[in-house]
Amino acid sequence: MALYDRRTLEGVYSVRQSVIYIQNYRYAEERMMRMMAGWIALTPELAVKLEMAKQVYEDALHTDALGKRLPELRAQPQISKPPNEAFVTFMNAIEDKEEWEDTIERLVGIYRVLKPHLISHYSSHLTAMNPVYEPPTLRILGRLVEEEKAHVERGSVLLNELLDSKEKHLRAANWQSHLEGLLGASGGVTGFEAEAEQPRKKVGRS
């Protein structure tokens, strides 16, 4: 993960770049919230249902907070934008696991792939923020990192309880590998891999 010197007033990202990233993050949070809400009725395990319901609520708050930040950066409020069609394909693959017996695949998609990926990007963005106009975004992303980490921790416990055989462990590993391939092909939530990302060329503040 790239680390940046936050002592410079200029920062790494322009206002316009920050807007694009926030729209990307909002897309991921909104899609994740909607797919998990749709899965609640399809999931037989009560503990998983209850945890999903709580996380749907918190992800809805994340979506709203990101959307409200946009007009403060001179952009239209509550807009979600995927970085590219390949990322949409990745998200569709996670969401399409709608069979009664697909709980393992659903949890793998969220807690082993999507949420850890978002945490990585949010954390990287936090290290690169402009200290003049970005403190509100810092607070939002800081909150998202902490809450998404808690989501992953609780979701991983639920997933591990379901992995009670070698066959189920193999199912989980194969699905994780498939999703990671799709995610890598998309370049991630902003269209770039977090580990390899370099700051985009500044395009101005208006």
Where are these regions (language model features)?
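An amphipathic alpha-helical core segment
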Residues: 137-177
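Amphipathic alpha-helical assembly/interaction segments
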Residues: 8, 67, 105, 109, ...
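A structural signal for well-ordered alpha-helices, especially hydrophobic packing surfaces
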Residues: 33, 63, 67-70, 119, ...
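Extended, helix-rich structural scaffolds rather than catalytic motifs
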Residues: 167-206
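Amphipathic alpha-helix face/heptad-repeat signature
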Residues: 25-28, 55, 107, 111-118, ...
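Acidic/His metal-coordination segments adjacent to aromatic residues that form catalytic metal sites
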Residues: 3-23, 82-114, 186, 190
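Conserved alpha-helical segments that form or flank metal/cofactor-binding pockets of metalloenzymes
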Residues: 50-91
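Helix-loop segments that flank and shape redox-cofactor active sites
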Residues: 31-54, 120-137
